[in-house]
Amino acid sequence: MTANVLFPLFANLHDRAVLVVGGGKVAERKTEALLKVGALPIIGAPSLTASLQRWAETGRITWRQGTFENSWLQEDIWLVIAATDQPEVNHAAARAAHAQRLFVNVVDDIALSNVQVPAVVERGPLRIAISSGGGAPMVARYLRQQLESLIDDSWGRLTTLFAQRRDTIRARYPNIEARRRFFETQLAGPLQRLLRKQRHAEAEAVLEAALAKTPPTESGSVTLVGAGAGDAGLLTLNALRALNEADIILYDRLVSDTVLQMARRDAEQIEVGKSATGHSVRQEDIHTLMLQHARAGQRVVRLKGGDPFVFGRGGEELEFLRTHGIPYEVIPGITAALACAAYAGIPLTHRDHAQSLCLITAHCQSSLDTLNWAALAQERQTLAFYMGVAGLPTIQQRLCEAGRTETTPFALIENGARAQQRVLTGTLKTLAHTAQTYAVRPPALLILGEVTALAEHLHWFGTTPLSAPCPPRTHPIS
C-alpha cells in the first residue's frame, strides 16, 4: 500500500496540551521533544519511566494514571501521540482522536497516523525536518546523520543574528525581491565563517555595515543555463545556483520536472518550449519575455535542455540581449550527444575506431539539404544526429548514396539518460526499418559509426540494447 503524500508543516505547540498515550521509553523520548518546544504534555499510562515520573513530580508534565480512556480527550488537546507497545491501546487512542478530528501520530503505524514526526536537525532556532512519510524512517534518520555532520552550530547563530534584526532588515528592504537578494548576499559573505570562529562581534559589525549601505539599484539580467540531457543529476553546480537565484525561469519542453523542482520555489516558471507537432512558442516571443522581465529588474534564467550553444539558439538570444543592453551570462550544460552516449556505453571517440566527432541537426528537410553528405560519409568518424527521428529515411538514403557503407553500425537512443531509456542498434542498411518497427519517438538521438558497436558489451544503464529486426525482403528507402 502506498502512503499518502504528506504536507510538510511545523506546529506551534507552545503552552498547548499534547496527549501522549504510553509511559515507556518511546513515550519518554516524545515527551522530552515536546518539552523542548514548550508544549504541555499530558501522559496517559498505568506506569512511567523514572524520567517521566520525575517530570510528573516536578510539575513539568501531567500524569493520567491508567489505560487510555476517551474522556482524556475532553481536555483542550491539540495533538495525540500513541506510543505504547499494545496495538489495541494505540488503535483505541487513534480512533478516538480521528473521531474528534485531532491530529494523531501512532508510533510505527502509518495507517493509523494522520501526522508523522520527522527526523530533525536542530541548530538553535534553525530546524531541518526530514520525513519518509513513515514508510522508511531509517532513510530519514540516515540523511539526518549526514546533515548533522555538514551543518555546524554557526548556522543556528546566523539564524539568530538575522532574526534579531528582522524588523530592521524589512524596513531597510521593503521590497521582497530586494530583501531576498540582501539575504543571499550576506549568506554568501563572511558572516557564517566569522560565527564558526566564534567571532560574534565582527559578524555583527559586518551585518550592521551592510545594513548601513544605500540599497543598490536593482538591474535585471539573463542567464542562459544548460539543464543537461535526461538525468537531473547531470545539472552542474553553477546551473543549480542560477536556478536558486532566479526570479523568472523560461524553460524548454525537454527540461524535466525534476530539474524544475530544484529551482527556487517562488520563482515564476514559464514554458517556452518548441515542438514539431504540438504547441510552440515563437523565438521572437521568447526574446520579448526575456527583455520584458530583465528590464523589470528581474533575474531571468533561460533554461534549455542539453547545452545552450548546441542547437539551442543560444547565440541568437545573446545577440538579441547584447543589442538591447541586457547583462547576460552563459552556463554550459551536458549536451545530448555526450549524455546519451555515456549512458548507452558508447565512447564517441576511440583510438581504434573514430578520431573525430560531428554534431548534426536533422530538425527539418531544409537542415538535411544543406549538409555535406560526402564529408559525413567518410570513415573513422562518429556522427551524432539531433532531432532526426522524422528524417531517418533521408539520413539513411543520403549517407548510402554518398558512399558510407551499409554495414556501418548505429545506435538510436530514445529518452537518453532517463529511466525509460531505450537503445536500438543495427547497421545503416536497417536504420529506417528499425525505427519504424520499434516505433521510435522523440526525444531520440542517432549515433552512427564504428564506436556504436561497443554498446553491446559496454552498456551499463537501463535495459540491454535491442538489436535491429530482420529487414523485409524488399525495403526501398522513401
UniProtKB/Swiss-Prot annotation:
Which residues does the annotation say bind S-adenosyl-L-methionine? Answer: G305, G306, D307, V310, T335, A336, M387, G416
Tell me the route in metabolism or biology where this protein functions: Cofactor biosynthesis; adenosylcobalamin biosynthesis; precorrin-2 from uroporphyrinogen III: step 1/1; Cofactor biosynthesis; adenosylcobalamin biosynthesis; sirohydrochlorin from precorrin-2: step 1/1; Porphyrin-containing compound metabolism; siroheme biosynthesis; precorrin-2 from uroporphyrinogen III: step 1/1; Porphyrin-containing compound metabolism; siroheme biosynthesis; siroheme from sirohydrochlorin: step 1/1
**Stretches for region Uroporphyrinogen-III C-methyltransferase:** 220-478
Modified positions (Phosphoserine) in chain numbering: S132
- UniProt keyword list: Cobalamin biosynthesis, Lyase, Methyltransferase, Multifunctional enzyme, NAD, Oxidoreductase, Phosphoprotein, Porphyrin biosynthesis, S-adenosyl-L-methionine, Transferase
Which family does the record assign? In the N-terminal section; belongs to the precorrin-2 dehydrogenase / sirohydrochlorin ferrochelatase family. In the C-terminal section; belongs to the precorrin methyltransferase family.
Q: What is this protein called?
A: Siroheme synthase
- Name its species: Xylella fastidiosa (strain Temecula1 / ATCC 700964)
